[in-house]
Amino acid sequence: MSHHVPNLYGTPIRDPHEHKRNSASMGEVNQSVSSRNCERGSEKGTKQRKKASRACDQCRRKRIKCRFDKHTGVCQGCLEVGEKCQFIRVPLKRGPAKKRASVASNEKFSSDNDPLQYRPRTHSYPMNSGNNYLPSLARNSSFPSISSLFVPSITAQSQQFVKVPYDDIKRRSSLATLGSDSSISTEFGGNYRLDENLNVRQEGKDIVAKGMITPVEEMGACSSNVRRQGSQSLPIQEQRASPYINPFISGRSRLSSLSYTSEATTSEGNTQGKNQCMLTPNSVRSIEKERLNSLTAGCPNKKLGTDGRSDKWDKNSTWKPVYRSSNPSHPSTEKNVSLNQEASAKPLMLGTYRQFDATSFYKVLGIYYNFFHINFPVIPINKSKFTDMLDPEKPNVIDEIRQINNEIIQCFKTALEVLVFCKIKQRRSSKSTKSWSRDSLCDFQKGLYYIQNFNKCIADCFQSLITIKPVLKQNSSVIPSRIKFIYFSTIIVLNFILILAGEESSLLLGPSVGVFNEFQAHKLFLPFENTSPMLLLNSNEESGDEILDYAVLFKRLYILLNILDTLQSFRLGQPKLINLNFGSAIETYFSDKTGHNQVVEKAPVALDNILRNLKLGEFITYFVLNRKSLQVNVPHHLLFTNQTDYGEFAVEKGEHDNIAGKFETLLKKKEILIRKLLNIEQKNDHILENCCNSDAEMKNIGELVCSMITLVSGILDSITNMNAENSVDLDSKPLPNAYFAQDSEEELMSPTQSITSNLASEENTRCTTKDLMGTVSIFMLPMVEECYNIISLIGPIPTTLISLYIRNGNMAKGINDRIMTLSTALNELVQITALFNTLEPFRKNAHDRAKRYYVSATSSTGCYESVMKSMYSGKCAASNASNVAPSEEENKKILKKFADIGWKLMDDSELGCCCCFFN
């Protein structure tokens, strides 16, 4: 009888005299894990599978051939539709799986190698039970735990799913090889470092106590060697930099994702989780090349503190962005890494050997300047100058400052990627050649990740900016102004993304205004800007051989933030956070008068459209600041006597040809119509006596309503022709190959900048609808919502006026012309209804409109009562109403209806176009 003496690690030591007697038994429980894996790998090395055991569920449902690609990890059919291969279909066939006719031999092999059937010997010394359940390798490395590398045969039906899509049991590397080194080198450069910031024993006890992992007692002795090797390599890990810290998963979430792998093997029926955690059949190099990101993405069922879409992504995750946080609460021993080193240290993308380096980022930057910048310059400088700002070697700075610079630039890249990838129009048809799935699988997977983790990406990126803020403020005098410009541009980009998506909260806008105010950005507009030190400004810095005035650039950023604040106030009816009067800031700071070096856009056509849109934002700011509902101490009689002066924003000749000019004119006419309709209520009897004879006021109302309907029709038609989905359409404006080259400044400029000299003439500097095809506008959603509210309220007026004219029977000269004009307006209303159904922002928000009704303001009949009317109830009675004879009951109802329309239009202006109320 042999005797086994347990060592200090709990692993029995074999008797040397029994080596010959036990050499023939592969499954002997006294053998070590590493030797057993090596023997099993050598024995089964010749049985390599060449393809998936069966077709995926998507191909089986479509009855097409499943062409599986080992490099991409998905079949061709799933790749074209942007899905992941699933193998969750329950088989109906009975009997063993293919190539498993000999059940007895396989059962013997599985019994020898199944760790769950291994019985550890009793320890001869006292031991804490919590240490037995601690999978140290799984807790401190980004590879799955030991239990996840072996898939036990729980039921007869689940046994044949072990081989989908690869036979990972027969083709895997030795665990001792994986655990011997704390860093797995790859052929693409960089090391994948294990996490050294965790206290292995204490964290393991806490997680087991909280129930985050399922203890597997049988794994205690089996993982002792690996646990010992992992603990010995911890001092080496602390000396290495970690380029693979994931910013989109917090420390606790990343911890739970790694600890879940030991739990996956004990849950029944979770075949998808098993397939996701299994190693690929190739060597360690193949593992790093094909499955690195899927292993570090976490388990399918982990719980995150964000929205539920994160769980959906983790099931099919093959890519996650890399971001290096600078949280001061977690000290790091990392060395300073240059920007080029950070770019090369990004995680490898599935199915591609090209890393996401500076070349592909210039492509993202080119998409922004082609599809976003032409409508709203979130980055208020031309592309060539901004590209120079991103150069990390200009100017030369010390290592500590370079690290801050690189972190800020990385934040900006993440924010710009979220903006671009979330607005790419995905093509389901295989005929399109500009879809991300056809262009680059890496880009396609980025888009999926950013869409499914949209809120989390925005929150984490902004939190990183807030973390950097104290360091930036403390070292403001030595940090270059170009880095501070990129920092505040990132804040503008994040707010732009949320407002573009129709976010109805200001959780990010308020802190953003606070950051600008903390750096005293508002003092740049005040007369005493030269008498006090500016945190934002250093001395003017050279960009190439030219000097940039960063004071003008920071003023542009603050004005853009003011316009974003205006759009939120316009939609939601809330007070503005920035109430500074900038005057004619657009013409002063954004036109080409500021100088050729810092012009917003070099192309005259694009610059003209930018100025028009910014002037629209300037007008809406003036429109919002003059809301009567926000003027608490204004006397009631000012409702009709104090009229807003819009003479400063007079419509120029030809300005109504574009969308911005039409919408500005629509808002002006809306205010005029409100005054006319409310004046009818004051002198209703007098108007009704002469409404069909000499009432010029009723005629003006009809003409005003018809002109507003025509404007709405023109606005919606232009939006539909330009970009109905308000997303990036690469088919309408393809990107040139110049974005992959950086040899000259012309190649870094957008296609709109390659213009001929004849465009400098006045008539050719107007931006047409053709120039805006496929571009994205932040004004589109407020325009569609406001047009919908206006049409819903003034739509019944033409029908009411036509019936009034016909019922009175007075068909004098001029009445027929009025009826024809009103009939034309009715035809346009039909076209407007069809246009609304084709607009993507309206369709996405239509189902939420029923929730925006103000229930407390409804009458007993169920009709909405105006909020503004209740505010001014009894305060706007007409002084001459008692001197007018009573009119007919039916005409009174018509006038009352017109007055209610005026009040509701006023509600739309005062309470926000997003919170609309209808009958």
Swiss-Prot record:
Which compartments is it annotated to reside in? Nucleus
Keywords recorded for this protein, A-Z? DNA-binding, Metal-binding, Nucleus, Transcription, Transcription regulation, Zinc
The keyword Chaperone is assigned to this record: no
CDD domains, per the entry = GAL4 (cd00067)
State the coiled-coil residue ranges. Answer: none
Identify a single GO molecular function assigned to this protein: zinc ion binding
DNA-binding segment(s): 56-85
Protein name as catalogued: Transcriptional regulatory protein EDS1
What lineage, starting at the top, does this entry show?
A: Eukaryota, Fungi, Dikarya, Ascomycota, Saccharomycotina
